[in-house]
């Protein structure tokens, strides 16, 4: 039924709960999972009370952390015997939810699976409001998986 499942991940326990649900579905349906991690510089910058100049070194650290999140998620999917692709995307403006929807359309995803209430700040991927926006605007079905 769903050949392509898009799964945004941020490394939080809630995000991993969503990933586990996607893996279970993909195994039954023979689907491919596409992982998406957004390096969201705007959220990182606004998480500080005082203004601070972010250096290339800080952005490199954010990207490296994102690559680690994707690698861990890929390992989990591969261990379950499910085909997997991964994408790291840097966002300098706009909402993460808009990017998730755009990437779902671009890849031809037939389902989006995401955990709700992820982390804030550096590890932020999807919060309640972003998950709600994905749910409202997505052209494909969305499975929201609530964290334990």
Please give the residue ranges for each predicted region.
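A short acidic, glycine-rich active-site loop
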Residues: 54-68
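Small/aliphatic-rich secondary-structure junction motif
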Residues: 3-53, 76-85
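Short, hinge-like loop/turn segments at secondary-structure boundaries
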Residues: 51-54, 103-105, 130-131
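Structural beta-alpha unit
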Residues: 75-112
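Glycine-rich, Arg-bearing micro-motifs that act as flexible, cationic patches
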Residues: 111-133
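Residue-level recognition of beta-strand->loop/alpha-helix junctions
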Residues: 37, 88-90, 146
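Short, flexible loop segments at boundaries between secondary-structure elements
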Residues: 142-148
């Amino acid at each position: 039924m769903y050949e392509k499942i898009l799964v945004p991940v941020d490394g939080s326990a809630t995000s991993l709960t969503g990933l586990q649900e996607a893996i279970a579905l993909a195994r039954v349906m023979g689907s491919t999972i596409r992982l998406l991690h957004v390096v969201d510089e705007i959220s990182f910058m606004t998480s500080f009370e005082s203004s601070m100049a972010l250096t290339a070194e800080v952005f490199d650290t954010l990207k490296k952390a994102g690559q680690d999140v994707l690698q861990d998620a890929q390992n989990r999917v591969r261990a379950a015997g499910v085909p997997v692709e991964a994408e790291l995307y840097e966002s300098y403006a706009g909402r993460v939810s808009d990017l998730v929807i755009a990437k779902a359309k671009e890849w031809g995803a037939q389902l989006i699976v995401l955990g709700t209430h992820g982390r804030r700040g550096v590890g932020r991927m999807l919060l309640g409001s972003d998950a709600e926006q994905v749910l409202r605007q997505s052209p494909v079905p969305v499975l929201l998986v609530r964290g334990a």
